[in-house]
Amino acid sequence: MTGNDTVGKLVDLGSGNFAYLQEGGSWGWSNAGLVTSEGVSLLVDTLFDLDLTRQMLGAFGAATPAAARIETLINTHNDGDHTHGNQLVPGARIIASSAAAEAMAAGVQPGTFTQLLDNAAELGDLGTFLHRNFGAFTFDDIDLVLPTETFVDKLTVTVGTKSVELIQVGPAHTPGDVIAYVPEDNTVFAGDILFNGSHPVIWAGPPSRWVDACDLILGWDAETIVPGHGPMATNDDVRRLKEYFLTLIELGGELRQKGLTPWEAAEHVTSRGMWPTWGESERLIVNFASVYQQLGDEPTFPDPMDGLTAMAQFSVAHEPKETIS
């Protein structure tokens, strides 16, 4: 049972489509979607732990009988907050890009989160950060179920009489990011290509690929956009995110030329009050590191855990002190 009382909010998108939004949209608090037609459904992503996924499936089930017949599950990428509940959708086709499936198999497993949290008191700033951001989740009993089908570039699947277009736009946030687009309803499930109201995090990059992904979404002029984190979005939100990356690329080039490290570049941005309402400013460190890599530097954080540790140190340095009991 999750230790956090946050309950997601069901949003009826019309035309038989639904979103499930988790309040805040911070680390681990992701969104999901449901597309229905002719009494069957397609689920876009599961959540970070089993209890949260059960709550989400229950909300969809209360909203539409079609939720009882989930024929297809799309994992938009490999992160656990979009895949850890896969086991609760038995019998469904599970589809992801080939790159996402490979990253799921090779990446951080649910048990690793448990081990890190159990030892948080001994991990310094990293432990404080993990306790603060992931302590509300329970990773026990998760059996990570991998995709049963994969694709490269594009794939069209059907749910009832509707077509759902899956477009691989990664590597960007992660190696194999996928956007799900429902042309009939002009609805986009953007996965973590869209963080609404917080800094995104570039685990893979390059950031220029993320700009291209924003352009793809804007080209649809979608009526409905479900982000991977945060509240329902508009095309203006997508434009803001595109401008964010364009600014990071330009500013990162200037700061790199001046010899600033990614940490110092992040300090430069936060000290000037850029994007003051966006949460998770610690992500600027890995984002600038990705910009520097795109400009020719060797990877600053070849191991993702190194990047997470740097973000933890930055976050703890800029937040009130916390004691882990």
Predicted regions and their residues:
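Metallo-beta-lactamase
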Residues: 12, 102-105, 109-168, 184, ...
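Active-site metal-binding motif and surrounding structural segment of the metallo-beta-lactamase
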Residues: 39-41, 51-96, 221
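Divalent-metal (often Zn2+) His-rich catalytic cores of metallo-beta-lactamase-fold enzymes
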Residues: 187, 209-271
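C-terminal regulatory/interaction regions
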Residues: 258-325
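Active-site neighborhood of phospho(di)ester-bond hydrolases with catalytic His/Asp-centered motifs
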Residues: 44-46, 69-79, 95-97, 169-170, ...
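Ligand/cofactor pocket segment of small-molecule handling proteins
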Residues: 153-220
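Divalent metal-coordination and catalytic microenvironments
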Residues: 16, 35, 45, 60, ...
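Conserved beta-strand hairpin/beta-sheet module of binuclear metal-dependent hydrolase folds
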Residues: 10-59, 178-191
